[in-house]
Structure formats: C-alpha cells, structure tokens
C-alpha cells in the first residue's frame, strides 16, 4: 500500500511538471490571470500542508496527523470548487484549448496528489495507533 501511494504521488508530480514544461517549451499562450491566481492559491495551500506534515514527522508529534487529515479534506473540496470555477469561465469567455487542457490536467493531478498524500498519512496514522496499542 505504501509503495502504491508513493508511486501515485510521484506520478502526479511528474505529470504536473512534464505537462507544464511542454506547454511552456512549445510557446503556448500563458494562462489567464484567474487561472494563475487559482493555481497560486493551491500552491500556497499545498506548501502549507506539506510543511505541516514535515513538522509532524520532524517533531514526532503523530497525534497531529488526524487534524491534518481533517483540514485537508477541505483542501480537496477547494480544488473541486476551482475546477467548477473554470467550467463557468469556459462558458462565459473564450479560452485556448491548450490552456484549458493544461489547467484541468494540473488541477486533477493536484487533487490526486493530495488524495495520495492523505491516504499515505491515514495509513501511517493507523500504523501508529496499532503500534501504541501493542506497547500498552
């Protein structure tokens, strides 16, 4: 299970970087301001989440994992809202198919990335709880 989640994380990161690099390297149009703003929001939230997870493991304060998991379910919902926002943008304004493909692809992979990280955390939380039960 752990290996599968790590592989999912790796594949999501690889897809996001590869698709973005190809888009830029092929001189496609830049993303719209709203799209860039949305991606920056996600980037900031993802950075905060990963820093919090890193701090948990550095301090070995594993009781905080449950809190992170609960908070980050809201993060997945936020990404879903951003996807819906883009659907509404497409309906009201003209958009480049290449930009839309890149944007949706990155959003969906980010959502998969978050879910894989959360699944890995949940698995570790379960392991930690079982370990505590055995030591009691």
Where are these regions (language model features)?
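Cytosolic, long alpha-helical scaffolding segments
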Residues: 1-136
């Amino acid at each position: 299970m752990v290996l599968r989640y790590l592989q999912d994380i790796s594949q999501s990161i690889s897809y996001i970087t590869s698709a973005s690099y190809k888009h830029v390297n092929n001189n496609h149009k830049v993303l719209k301001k709203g799209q860039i703003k949305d991606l920056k929001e996600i980037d900031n939230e993802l950075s905060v989440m990963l820093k919090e997870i890193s701090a948990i493991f550095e301090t070995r304060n594993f009781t905080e994992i449950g809190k992170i998991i609960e908070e980050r379910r809201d993060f997945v919902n936020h990404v879903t809202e951003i996807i819906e926002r883009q659907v509404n943008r497409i309906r009201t304004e003209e958009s480049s198919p290449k930009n839309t493909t890149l944007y949706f692809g990155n959003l969906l992979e980010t959502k998969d990335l978050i879910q894989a990280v959360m699944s890995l955390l949940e698995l570790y939380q379960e392991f930690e709880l079982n370990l505590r039960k055995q030591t009691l």
